[in-house]
């Protein structure tokens, strides 16, 4: 499972012109599910997202987590992150989970996030989405679980 974590000052996701998820300061995370992933990987990714220290403390050091700052968590499914880009001029998606598994694990991740944290929003799995964000820093990390 992969999560592209971006620290944001604000972000929103639209589907067909309608805002389906939005946060103020926090983390926008693009999530890709891979064929061998399970709920265990989703649990590990969520733990890392809530506790990864990417927000600055009073001394300007990245020492605070999402939980510490009380920011929002916006989860957006993006199977293209699992693409194999090593060969040729076209990405291969054979390294991405089948849609049914991707939907199941993304939904599990989202439900666990909502159960463990108050400020959670999401895009819509499989939809054509427009993601708007104000990247803070920019601070971006690829998490591979």
Swiss-Prot record:
EC number: 3.1.1.96
Gene Ontology annotations for the cellular component aspect, listed alphabetically: cytoplasm
Subcellular locations according to the entry: Cytoplasm
Enzyme class of the recorded protein, top EC level: hydrolase
An annotated GO BP: D-amino acid catabolic process
Any GO MF annotation of the entry: Gly-tRNA(Ala) deacylase activity
Motif mapping: Gly-cisPro motif, important for rejection of L-amino acids: 137-138
Pfam families: Tyr_Deacylase
Keyword terms: Cytoplasm, Hydrolase, RNA-binding, tRNA-binding
HAMAP family: Deacylase_Dtd (MF_00518)
Protein purpose: An aminoacyl-tRNA editing enzyme that deacylates mischarged D-aminoacyl-tRNAs. Also deacylates mischarged glycyl-tRNA(Ala), protecting cells against glycine mischarging by AlaRS. Acts via tRNA-based rather than protein-based catalysis; rejects L-amino acids rather than detecting D-amino acids in the active site. By recycling D-aminoacyl-tRNA to D-amino acids and free tRNA molecules, this enzyme counteracts the toxicity associated with the formation of D-aminoacyl-tRNA entities in vivo and helps enforce protein L-homochirality.
Written domain comment of the UniProt record: A Gly-cisPro motif from one monomer fits into the active site of the other monomer to allow specific chiral rejection of L-amino acids.
SUBUNIT field: Homodimer.
Protein name in UniProt: D-aminoacyl-tRNA deacylase
């Amino acid at each position: 499972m992969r999560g592209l974590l971006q620290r944001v000052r604000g972000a929103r996701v639209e589907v067909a012109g309608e805002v389906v998820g939005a946060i103020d300061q926090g983390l926008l995370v693009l999530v890709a599910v891979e064929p061998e992933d399970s709920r265990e990987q989703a649990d590990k990714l969520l733990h890392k997202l809530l506790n990864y220290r990417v927000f600055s403390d009073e001394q300007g050091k990245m020492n605070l987590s999402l939980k510490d700052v009380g920011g929002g968590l916006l989860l957006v499914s993006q199977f293209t992150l699992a693409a194999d880009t090593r060969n040729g001029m076209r990405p291969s998606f054979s390294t991405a989970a089948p849609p049914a598994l991707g939907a199941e694990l993304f939904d599990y991740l989202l439900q666990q996030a909502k159960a463990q944290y108050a400020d959670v929003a999401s895009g819509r799995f499989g939809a054509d989405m427009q993601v708007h964000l104000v990247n803070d820093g920019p601070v971006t990390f690829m998490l591979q679980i």
